Amino acid sequence: DRLGNEGQIQLVLPSLLAELSVLEAGPVNRSNTDFPIALSAGERRDYTANTIYRDFGWRRKDPDGSLRISPEDAATIGVETGDQARITTLVGSALARVEVTDRMMPGHAAIPNGFGLDNDDGTRSGVAPNELTSLGDCDKFAGTPHHKFVPARIEAVA
């Protein structure tokens, strides 16, 4: 079936052709008034590669895997770098230390992968991205959760 009349391989997959029309419509806005922030749950940072997380020396600058947000969102929410904030998604909630940075666009936030694990001393550092990510909100072909766009709400913690 993959060889055409000219003896060339046919790469067109009919099951995917209909999906291409979605691209013409432009970006999908998955945020809403209850969850206005696009959370990247599992941002790759230079010190979160797999189990490097367990070596505290690698993460001296950011021991808790901070929640990165834009200055605009920080002002709206009422938080500054070092403050605690609550991240809430459809499936979970967690506390995180805030890092305000112009590396984040307004309406977007990020937490790193490799955190939320229990330490040998019984403490827990950072947020486990999977606890905020819905298994019901997945890519329809691959079946993987949309870790890079989790609708979320962020609130200041007094």
Protein language model features and the residues they cover:
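Long, contiguous, secondary-structure-rich segments that constitute the structural scaffold
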Residues: 55-68, 72-158
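Long, low-complexity segments enriched in small/aliphatic residues
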Residues: 1-57
